């Protein structure tokens, strides 16, 4: 529209007094061969004088306008060519992006997502299995810890029993030692009593022998000297008394010895039985202690093995969980990158579509402008010979006042394939 206004202003500069009209056609009317368009349809010429000196100025102005319009058309053609090249380039990029988009769609990202989901499900399943195994191992560890605590309690109880048995055994040994000492003391006493009995018997025998010798000497002396009283009965009586006393003492000593020996024998037997029982119990406790020690060592080894296996399982579980987390993060990053790339391609495609739409609109606008300019320029060239210039008589009063009024009417007709598409009319008033 600016170019049209500039052209109209340029035309206004060389149009003389009067009216210039561009003949128009009715919309939809087709031009046949040999049809001439009248650019200015004037009223019938009045009997006046025609000034042909204005034709040269009009021709020069028209040529200048034609040159400027030709330069503008060349510039527009260059710009139009560059736009066409740009449009072709963008269309090629659009086709390439569309092909890439179709290729990406043909890859069926849903199946890829299904594959990722299947792999994620498998990884989650393995993670759940590892978690279950870890929980099971923890339960087994707790059970073994409870068993170990029970065994340790039993070991403590057995240790206490062993200590008690050892204390009892020490007491029994002390009692046995005391009984042995008492037995030895009694044996020494018995030996001393036996020696004393033997000594007393020996003394008694010597006394009896001495008495017998004395009795024999006295009897002989009595027999020799005089008849003395009978001492044999007295000696026999004394002898009988002494023998009875010795026998009684011997019997009492033997009875006392037998009773003491029986008591000591019974005490020794009891102590020996208790000692044997204590030794048997100590041996049983020792065997139980050895068995429990072996069980404890076995359980300790089993516990250490299970703890080592549990640590290995936990470390492997941590490593596998870390690898699964890394794989999951990597898959999520790949999915996110694919989504971002897809969004970027879609955004680029949308931008290219917007650019293409804008270029299509601009091309259509330029095409319409070019067609309008071509139609507008072609009509005056073809009908330049039909221009009719007339000079009207001016009012004396108006001339004397030094003012000249001009009415310029510009009628533009747009044609395509010989058909009138658009017709416009502009009227300008100028005072000189």
Swiss-Prot record:
Top-level taxonomic group: Eukaryota
Name the record gives this protein: Glial fibrillary acidic protein
PTM annotation (Omega-N-methylarginine): residues: 12
MF terms (GO), sorted A to Z: identical protein binding; integrin binding; kinase binding; structural constituent of cytoskeleton
UniProt region (Coil 2A), positions on chain: 231-252
Record annotation: effect of changing residue 210 to K: In ALXDRD; affects intermediate filaments formation
Lineage: Eukaryota, Metazoa, Chordata, Craniata, Vertebrata
Region described as Tail: 378-432
Modified residues (Citrulline): 30, 36, 270, 406, 416
Region span, Head: 1-72
Organism: Homo sapiens
């Amino acid at each position: 529209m600016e170019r049209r206004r500039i052209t109209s202003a340029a035309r206004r500069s060389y149009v003389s007094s009067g009216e210039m009209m561009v003949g128009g056609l009715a919309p939809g009317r087709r031009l046949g061969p040999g049809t001439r368009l009248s650019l200015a349809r004037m009223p019938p010429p009045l009997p006046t004088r025609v000034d042909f000196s204005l034709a040269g100025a009009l021709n020069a102005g028209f040529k200048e306008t034609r040159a400027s319009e030709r330069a503008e058309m060349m510039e527009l053609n260059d710009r139009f060519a560059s736009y066409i090249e740009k449009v072709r380039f963008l269309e090629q990029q659009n086709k390439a992006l569309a092909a890439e988009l179709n290729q990406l769609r043909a890859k069926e990202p849903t199946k890829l997502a299904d594959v990722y989901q299947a792999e994620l499900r498998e990884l989650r399943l393995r993670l759940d299995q590892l978690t279950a195994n870890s929980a099971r191992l923890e339960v087994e560890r707790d059970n073994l810890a409870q068993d170990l605590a029970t065994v340790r309690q039993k070991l403590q109880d057995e240790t206490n029993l062993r200590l008690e048995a050892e204390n009892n055994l020490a007491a029994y040994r002390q009692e046995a030692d005391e009984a042995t000492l008492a037995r030895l003391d009694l044996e020494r006493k018995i030996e001393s009593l036996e020696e004393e009995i033997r000594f007393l018997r020996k003394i008694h025998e010597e006394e009896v022998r001495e008495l017998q010798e004395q009795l024999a000497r006295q009897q002989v002396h009595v027999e020799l000297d005089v008849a003395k009283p009978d001492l044999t009965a007295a000696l026999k009586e004394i002898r009988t008394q002494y023998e009875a006393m010795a026998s009684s003492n011997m019997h009492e000593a033997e009875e006392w010895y037998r009773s003491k020996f029986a008591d000591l024998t019974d005490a020794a037997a009891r102590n020996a039985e208790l000692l044997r029982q204590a030794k048997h119990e100590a041996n049983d406790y020792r065997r139980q202690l050895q068995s429990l020690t072996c069980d404890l060592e076995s359980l300790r080894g089993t516990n250490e093995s299970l703890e080592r296996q549990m640590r290995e399982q936990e470390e492997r579980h941590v490593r596998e969980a870390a690898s699964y987390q890394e794989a999951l993060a990597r898959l999520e990053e790949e999915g996110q990158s694919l989504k971002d790339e897809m969004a970027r391609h879609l955004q680029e495609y949308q931008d290219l579509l917007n650019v293409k739409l804008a270029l299509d609109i601009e091309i259509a606008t330029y095409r319409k402008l070019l067609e309008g300019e071509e139609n507008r320029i072609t009509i005056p060239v073809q009908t330049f010979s039909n221009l009719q210039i007339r000079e009207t008589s001016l009012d004396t009063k108006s001339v004397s006042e030094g003012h000249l009024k001009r009415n310029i009417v510009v009628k533009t007709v747009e044609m395509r394939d010989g058909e009138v598409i658009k017709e416009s009319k502009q009227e300008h008033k100028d005072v000189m």
